[in-house]
Amino acid sequence: MPYFTIDTNIPQNSISSAFLKKASNVVAKALGKPESYVSIHVNGGQAMVFGGSEDPCAVCVLKSIGCVGPKVNNSHAEKLYKLLADELKIPKNRCYIEFVDIEASSMAFNGSTFG
């Protein structure tokens, strides 16, 4: 159930379907989860200031049942920052990514929780 949310000041009409699909693939591979469970949500066109500047920036959250934590978050960060820099031109120093480990019993899909 990985869920990657990106809040950015990049205009919403600049967020392509191809980016969404690539982000889904990157998250699935990074976490070793089936892509059929991955959700990508981009909130473009947000009024944002990062470091006192309105230059392109983002604040992101990656939520997952397991597969995130101190031992693996640096690896995930490397892949996600590369995605954001390559595809949306958001520099690594203009983005925060929060990693959240969700309890299976706190997330539902298809009518029931995962645990």
Curated annotation (Swiss-Prot):
The keyword Heme does not apply. Gene3D superfamilies: Macrophage Migration Inhibitory Factor (3.30.429.10). Pfam families: MIF. Substrate binds at K33, I65. The active site is at P2 (proton acceptor). It comes from the Eukaryota. It is found in: Secreted. The keyword Isomerase applies. It catalyses: L-dopachrome = 5,6-dihydroxyindole-2-carboxylate; 3-phenylpyruvate = enol-phenylpyruvate. Its EC number is 5.3.2.1, 5.3.3.12. Keywords: Cytokine, Isomerase, Secreted. PROSITE patterns: MIF (PS01158). One of its GO terms (molecular function) is cytokine activity. One of its GO terms (cellular component) is extracellular space. Belongs to the MIF family. Tautomerization of the methyl ester of L-dopachrome. Inhibits migration of human peripheral blood mononuclear cells. This is Macrophage migration inhibitory factor homolog. It comes from Brugia malayi.
